[in-house]
Amino acid sequence: MLSYEQITDLLRQTGLPFAYHHFSEGESPDPPFLVYLTPGSHNFSADGMVYCRVDQLDIELYTDKKQPEQEAKLEAVLDEAGLFYNKTEQFIRSEQLYEVLYEMEV
């Protein structure tokens, strides 16, 4: 399980601004930027107790246009840390932003 500090250390390596869950109103930087959150867990149990804690970690990359180089930079950081992830992408019309979502367990 990665600690909060370890996760933020990884995100710092991208050189992009980031925040947990969301940026405060009026504080959102210009894209590209990252948002991360831990929306739940998939803990492993033994004898009716949590034997091994496994948190979900979502990292969202927001850009105003498709930016494969930013995706590659984030993926290199995740790969170097040995994290397995799944990736999806969508365009958020109301925000005029692309979101690339990286989902993993830590």
Predicted segment positions?
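Long, contiguous binding/interaction regions
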Residues: 1-56, 62-106
